[in-house]
Amino acid sequence: MPHIQSTLVEVKRAQGKGRGVFALADIKKGTIIERVPVVILPLREVFGSGPRTRLAEYAFAWGPDKMAIACGYGSLYNHSYTPNARFYADGPASQVFAAIRNIRSGEEVTVNYDGRPRAKSPVTFEVA
């Protein structure tokens, strides 16, 4: 499937979170917000043996020994334990972000970094 750079969202400042992804229009539940390519890296290149790198803040698990960086807005969606969107792998090197409920224009689009929308797995930062 082709990659989609979304016209439904934009990146702007998110209160207490740095940047975030926000809806430019109402988005209906089930809508694919964007389909993006991912850059796949060996786990050791992201985390190495030294201190945590800035790159690690944007990477997510891609199988047992790999990490991925999502292109497009993919690495800019903020985490929420009550997300309005989800992400999932779409082929060997693509990621999809889709609405799991209706999202209002101007609302921040968030995902659960665990990959499961209802998961309560702890994250390594304070959730705003």
Where are these regions (language model features)?
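Conserved catalytic SET/PR domain of SAM-dependent protein methyltransferases, capturing the structural core
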Residues: M1-A128
